[in-house]
């Protein structure tokens, strides 16, 4: 009996010792892990590697597209390149479809997204944004002579939209059915071919398209009352990185670099 008691006490001692060890090894995770660690890791990673990896479409003029030489360019591309330069690192772009952009950011394929990403409450629940660098409005685009002349006319009509965009939500809010597309260019193709009735998109994008293609058989027939703002997109827990990016954006606005880039692409300041 005495041997049994001693054995039991020894076993209890071992269990308590193991529990204490487990508690000690878990403690650092609760104090050093989580979002603070992620924040520090992203900024440190970018600085150590000397590269800021940026997700973008590359098919969305004038924000991100390929020019006649095949070079990736556009307003968002130049803004992101300037931000990277002011952080002392190189900008590296990874192109992907819009609807895969957020999954790519989640999977850490890139450090941020530069693709005129609109700020909305739903996205803010899952992601973090830099300070805004674009202010724009949604417009309704239809073939010339269409019976659709206002957003209210979208009830029961087919609208070509990127499925996860703010503009898809706008079209649905007016009763439109949605035809999913991979970007603005495909939406315009479907509109020109008569396969859809309309598309809702950014006024800056549509105006640029009409400037490049004045013969296009489409027109803007309505414009949303409220303006939307867009910003650079990050994973949750990127606080220090975003602070540095915001400093760079503020410096660009202060020294006139932002306005120079904006005037180049739009002929005006698109933040005001």
State what each model feature region is.
Residues 117-124, 170-173, 197-227:
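A ligand-binding cleft/hinge motif common to bilobed small-molecule-binding domains
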Residues 135-142, 207-250, 268-272:
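Periplasmic-binding protein-like
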Residues 22, 77-78, 82-86, 165, ...:
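Extended ligand-binding regions for polar small-molecule ligands
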Residues 17-20:
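C-terminal motif of bacterial Sec signal peptides marking the signal peptidase cleavage site
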Residues 33-114:
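Extracytoplasmic small-molecule ligand-binding "clamshell" domains
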Residues 93-103, 146, 163-166, 179-193, ...:
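Short helix-initiation/N-cap motifs at beta->coil->alpha
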Residues 50-56, 151-164:
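Short loop->beta-strand "edge-of-pocket" segments that line small-molecule binding or catalytic clefts
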Residues 81, 85, 90-153:
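Acidic, polar ligand-binding/catalytic clefts
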């Amino acid at each position: 009996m005495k041997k049994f008691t001693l054995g039991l006490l020894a076993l209890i001692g071992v269990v308590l010792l193991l529990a204490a060890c487990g508690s000690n090894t878990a403690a650092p995770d609760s104090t050093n892990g989580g979002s603070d660690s992620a924040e520090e890791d992203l900024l440190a990673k970018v600085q150590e590697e000397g590269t800021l990896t940026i997700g973008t479409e590359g098919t969305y003029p004038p924000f991100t597209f390929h020019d006649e030489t095949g070079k990736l360019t556009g307003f968002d591309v130049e803004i992101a390149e300037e931000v990277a330069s002011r952080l002392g690192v190189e900008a590296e772009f990874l192109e992907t479809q819009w609807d895969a952009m957020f999954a790519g950011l989640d999977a850490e394929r890139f450090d941020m997204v530069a693709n005129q990403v609109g700020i909305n409450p739903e996205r803010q629940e899952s992601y973090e944004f830099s300070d805004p660098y674009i202010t724009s409005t949604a417009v309704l685009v239809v073939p010339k002579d269409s019976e659709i002349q206002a957003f209210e006319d979208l009830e029961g009509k087919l609208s070509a939209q990127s499925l996860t965009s703010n503009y898809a939500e706008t079209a649905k809010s007016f009763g439109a059915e949605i035809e999913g597309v991979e970007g603005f260019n495909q939406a315009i193709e479907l509109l020109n071919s008569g396969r859809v009735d309309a598309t809702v998109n950014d006024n800056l994008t549509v105006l640029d398209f009409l400037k490049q293609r004045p013969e296009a058989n489409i027109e803007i027939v309505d414009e949303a009352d409220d303006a939307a703002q867009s910003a650079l997109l990050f994973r949750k827990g990127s606080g220090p990185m975003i602070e540095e990016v915001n400093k760079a954006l503020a410096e660009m606005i202060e020294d006139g670099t932002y306005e120079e880039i904006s005037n180049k692409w739009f002929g005006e300041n698109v933040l005001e």
